[in-house]
Amino acid sequence: MRRLRRLVHLVLLCPFSKGLQGRLPGLRVKYVLLVWLGIFVGSWMVYVHYSSYSELCRGHVCQVVICDQYQKGIISGSVCQDLCELQKVEWRTCLSSAPGQQVYSGLWQDKEVTIKCGIEEALNSKAWPDAVPRRELVLFDKPTRGTSIKEFREMTLSFLKANLGDLPSLPALVDQILLMADFNKDSRVSLAEAKSVWALLQRNEFLLLLSLQEKEHASRLLGYCGDLYLTESIPHGSWHGAVLLPALRPLLPSVLHRALQQWFGPAWPWRAKIAIGLLEFVEELFHGSYGTFYMCETTLANVGYTATYDFKMADLQQVAPEATVRRFLQGRHCEQSSDCIYGRDCRAPCDKLMRQCKGDLIQPNLAKVCELLRDYLLPGAPADLYEELGKQLRTCTTLSGLASQVEAHHSLVLSHLKTLLWREISNTNYS
């Protein structure tokens, strides 16, 4: 007990000499209060972190909900047996940034995977005591029993037209969806298979994964069970994903984000290679087989890359089809342009006479990406390249006008940027 008292005395009073303590007894009390205040603040931060973590990371809830519906025969999929019966899907690190969209790293069939599952309804257990039944009724309500395969095909085609636009390539995409639904290859689509695929199509990212499956820079879809799905893992996600826990990411200012990126990010030539991949991804989104797509949250959080520094889009949640963005914005009431926003940064002009948003976006994908690349590429750039690179990125960020009307200029600027970066790294080991 005496040793404990001595230790406390040393910790709390050591900074002051005995003479100073005698002359200034008030300082002793202030110092003790300061120490206890530090302990309180630290404890509060730990509590907030873990309460946020428990809210963000609820993969166990997701698995319980999905497996409950699988065992009832409501849903099916290529991963269901391994997930719910054989326990061969291993959940590892929580990567979620929002409670309603659960994201985990994992292992399946000896492959590193990313597990994604939405649990919006299941999280509302206080407001909805019957959360699981409500989820199956709302999310897995279509198609209904008795729907023919022809009706399901037409239903799927109509859904794709509404979300991607009326494109000649859509019937081929419907065939691909029906082929995926028949995961057990018995040449028929059961009601459970149809319900699962229909629920998956309601997930924006899943629809994007299907549309961009042939593209080099989107993650490959590996399997699903109900509306839970697995994609190939991106070995190196965004820089702050590796450095920070999800609950702390929104708390840091952008200046500190950039500083951390410099400290923990790859060397400049590797960053140049990743940037080239990001520019190629912008090309892939522009007038592809299934229309044009807009990036509506352009941040370093979405910049992922493989072990060989090839760019992979880490998150497609904020990439939206042109038809979806137009439908949301066109005719929407507005007083100013700031009222016409889809996602975080897809902005349309406001017709102040009609007080309605227009459907065309003001800033194209490339301008937003170049703004991002200024912070990503200019720090640490070779001295002989710095001025020209800065000039081209400034030109690129000033691309304006309606996103649908800048095609020629867009392509020219993008080509110049890619050429400049490739020229710098093409004759080195970094290429």
Curated annotation (Swiss-Prot):
Q: Does the keyword Glycoprotein apply?
A: no
Where, in residue ranges, is this chain on the Cytoplasmic side? 1-30
Q: Which residues lie on this side of the membrane: Lumenal?
A: 52-431
Q: How is it modified after translation?
A: Among the many cysteines in the lumenal domain, most are probably involved in disulfide bonds.
Task: Please report, in chain numbering, the residue ranges of the motif May mediate ER retention.
Answer: 5-6
Where this protein primarily resides, as one coarse class?
endoplasmic reticulum
Task: Name which cysteines form disulfide bonds.
Answer: C57-C94, C62-C117
Q: Which GO terms describe its cellular component?
A: endoplasmic reticulum membrane
Record's keyword terms, sorted: Disulfide bond, Endoplasmic reticulum, Membrane, Signal-anchor, Transmembrane, Transmembrane helix
Q: Does the keyword Endoplasmic reticulum apply?
A: yes
Membrane topology according to the record: Single-pass type II membrane protein
The record lists the membrane-crossing segments as 31-51
Subcellular localization, as worded in the UniProt entry: Endoplasmic reticulum membrane
InterPro entries found in the cross-reference section:
FAM69_kinase_dom, FAM69_N
Top-rank taxon: Eukaryota
The record's comment on protein family reads: Belongs to the DIPK family.
What is this protein called in UniProt? Divergent protein kinase domain 1B
According to its UniProt entry, this protein's organism is Rattus norvegicus (Rat)
Lineage, top ranks: Eukaryota, Metazoa, Chordata, Craniata, Vertebrata
This protein's gene is called: Dipk1b
